[in-house]
Amino acid sequence: MKYCLLCLVVALSGCQTNDTIASCKGPIFPLNVGRWQPTPSDLQLRNSGGRYDGA
């Protein structure tokens, strides 16, 4: 019974925090924005590493 009461107190105390929810601002990938251009070999399926049967 003491263990259940302790778990209940810990769970309810976690609900009383006043911290704001973390949020991201800005672009998803802020490094090297607009500097990378794919080459034709980057766009071919055989270089993707997955299974490709050509069908």
From Swiss-Prot:
<keyword id="KW-0449">Lipoprotein</keyword>
<keyword id="KW-0472">Membrane</keyword>
<dbReference type="Pfam" id="PF17413">
    <property type="entry name" value="VirB7"/>
</dbReference>
<dbReference type="InterPro" id="IPR035545">
    <property type="entry name" value="VirB7"/>
</dbReference>
<comment type="subunit">
    <text>Homodimer and heterodimer of virB7 and virB9; disulfide-linked.</text>
</comment>
<keyword id="KW-0564">Palmitate</keyword>
<feature type="signal peptide">
    <location>
        <begin position="1"/>
        <end position="14"/>
    </location>
</feature>
<feature type="lipid moiety-binding region" description="S-diacylglycerol cysteine">
    <location>
        <position position="15"/>
    </location>
</feature>
<comment type="function">
    <text>Is essential for the biogenesis of the T-pilus, which is required for virulence and T-DNA transfer to plant cells. When is associated with virB9, might function as a nucleation center for recruitment of VirB proteins during assembly of the T-DNA transfer machine.</text>
</comment>
<dbReference type="GO" id="GO:0009279">
    <property type="term" value="C:cell outer membrane"/>
</dbReference>
<keyword id="KW-0614">Plasmid</keyword>
<keyword id="KW-0998">Cell outer membrane</keyword>
<feature type="lipid moiety-binding region" description="N-palmitoyl cysteine">
    <location>
        <position position="15"/>
    </location>
</feature>
<protein>
    <recommendedName>
        <fullName>Outer membrane lipoprotein virB7</fullName>
    </recommendedName>
</protein>
<keyword id="KW-0732">Signal</keyword>
<keyword id="KW-1015">Disulfide bond</keyword>
<keyword id="KW-0192">Crown gall tumor</keyword>
<keyword id="KW-0843">Virulence</keyword>
